A protein has these predicted regions:
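ATP-dependent carboxylate-amine ligase
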Residues: 1-34, 38, 43-49, 61, ...
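Phosphate-binding loop of NTP-binding sites
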Residues: 19-23, 43, 57-60, 69, ...
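Generic beta-sheet signal
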Residues: 30, 52, 91, 135, ...
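Short, polar loop motifs at secondary-structure junctions
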Residues: 32-35, 53-55, 71-73, 221-225, ...
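Beta-strand->loop->alpha-helix junctions that form or flank phosphate-binding loops
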Residues: 50-53, 91-96, 134-138, 233-254, ...
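Acidic-glycine-rich active-site phosphate/pyrophosphate-binding loop
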Residues: 251-267
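C-terminal accessory "lid"/substrate-recognition subdomains
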Residues: 260, 279-280
Length: 458
């Protein structure tokens, strides 16, 4: 079968392209911006890429077109597909129909930690000999790709609540039919497609409804939004994580780089790993609980996490210059910002200076729905720098004024980088947070710090 994918360079759609190729299909695709690293990964798999959406790419006609959720009516290829009656479907539907239908699916859903937790679950299964398939929103550090078919019945998927396509406004995860479901947490997000928290809870309950009776749902006992969702009706086994739940994690070090796994009042494993932060400890415990459902002994799962490498952009060290360390993180919601800063504070200690540099880039952020929570979420930083995005209905200056620590802002990435470089001193830790590229600010900071060091020597 010849399959053409519209919007192929996104992580999810690129992952589907790799799976389709592994199944023996001829695969082509197009995107508005054909860019690495995804373009490089796809070309290595023998997938031809086309820049832009000129309708001529559909001649000769493919057997099937998979349409990404960024595609809208008016797109030349979308219009040609509809006009010529070319068979089409969304990515999540294709994934179910051609890959997941006969697999034991372990799905990881929630507002935060999906990529990390899915990567952990995948690595546990891999390290314990299960050879799972997976589709994950970032490339897990222990693997070279974001998706593969695997060699067993088990398949791990990052289960996103975003919509499927212009013709299917349900959340992607309703197509995945998991037998093991992790619900990490639930907060209001994706304000561009959801009106309120109840609208998201409704979609999460659709997901809960399709887990089999002998399937298992694992979730934190202290998450009120998930409790409300589960109270709408659950027909599957449940395991709770937390102080009053079945599972607990107990820190052995302040930065959570070592911790114990407890199940029903008994210690069943111990994790010593390269990650830090209570949020990662929580993610790891969820992954261990999910792996147990498919047959992995918790002690073995805990040992496997000792060699886990996180996906890029999760408190990732980008470099050091002039005694200043620069980190990058994907955090783009107040809860994630708070957790990431707490993790870094635990890592570097209470006296080291942390400089937080934030780009409010997600749709929810741009709409201003989180702005009142931003200043409190930045509380563990010693100094704050904010980028003012263009054309948004609020000013980051309001957040800067609400911060208890010194806070600064600029509408220009270069100017912001210069401000940070001037402020930074040897021994400081700069944490850059954005769900985008932030105008290449990481390298600008490292270059600026190196120049500053050179000038000081002269």
């Amino acid at each position: 079968m010849r399959i053409h994918i519209l919007g192929i360079c996104g992580t999810f759609m690129g992952g589907l392209a790799m799976l389709a190729r592994s199944l023996g299909h001829e695969v082509t695709g197009s995107d508005a911006n054909v860019y690495p690293p995804m373009s490089t990964l796809l070309e290595k798999q023998g997938i031809d890429l086309i820049q832009g959406y000129d309708a001529s790419q559909l001649d000769p006609q493919p057997d099937l077109v998979i349409i990404g959720n960024a595609m809208t009516r008016g797109n030349p290829c979308v219009e040609a597909v509809l006009e010529k009656n070319i068979p089409y479907m969304s990515g999540p539907q294709w994934l179910h129909d051609f890959v997941l239908r006969d697999r034991w699916v372990l799905a990881v859903a929630g507002t935060h930690g999906k990529t990390t937790t899915a990567g952990m679950a995948t690595w546990i299964l891999e390290a314990c000999g299960y050879k799972p398939g997976f589709v994950i929103g970032g490339v897990p550090g222990n693997f070279e790709v974001s998706a593969r078919l695997g060699e067993s019945d088990f398949f791990v998927i990052e289960a996103d609540e975003y919509d499927c396509a212009f013709f299917d406004k349900r959340s992607k995860f309703v197509h995945y039919c998991p037998r093991t479901l992790i619900l990490n947490n639930l907060e209001f997000d994706h304000a561009d497609i959801f009106d309120d928290l109840k609208a998201i809870q409704k979609q999460f309950h659709h997901l809960v409804r399709i887990v089999p009776g002998q399937g298992r749902i694992i979730y934190p006992e202290n998450d009120i939004n998930l409790k409300q969702t589960m109270a709408m009706g659950c027909w599957s086994e449940q395991e709770l994580v937390g102080e009053q739940g079945h599972w607990q994690a107990k820190k052995l070090t302040t930065d959570a780089s070592e911790w114990e796994v407890w199940l029903d009042g008994e210690k069943v494993g111990e994790v010593k790993w390269g990650l830090v932060g209570e949020h990662n400890m929580h993610n790891g415990l969820m992954a261990i609980a999910a792996a147990r459902h498919v047959g992995v002994v918790p002690a073995d799962a805990a040992n496997a996490l000792g060699s886990f490498i996180n996906a890029r952009r999760r408190l990732e060290l980008r470099g050091e210059a002039n005694g200043v360390t620069v980190y990058d993180d994907f955090a783009h919601h107040p809860t994630a910002i708070l957790a990431t800063l707490a993790a870094l504070r635990g890592k570097v200690g209470g006296t080291a200076r942390i400089i937080a540099v934030l780009e409010p880039r997600s749709n929810t952020m741009k709409m201003g729905l989180c702005k009142d929570d931003l200043a409190p979420s930045l509380g563990r930083a010693d100094e704050v720098f904010l980028l003012q995005p263009p054309h948004i209905p609020w000013q980051v200056a309001e957040v800067a004024e609400a911060c208890v620590q010194p806070a600064h802002w600029s509408g220009d990435v270069d100017a912001l980088a210069d401000m940070v470089v001037k402020t930074a001193q040897s021994g400081d830790h700069i944490l850059v947070m954005s769900n985008g590229g932030f105008g290449g600010i990481h390298q600008k900071l490292l270059d600026g710090l190196a120049k500053k060091a050179q000038a000081e020597e002269e």
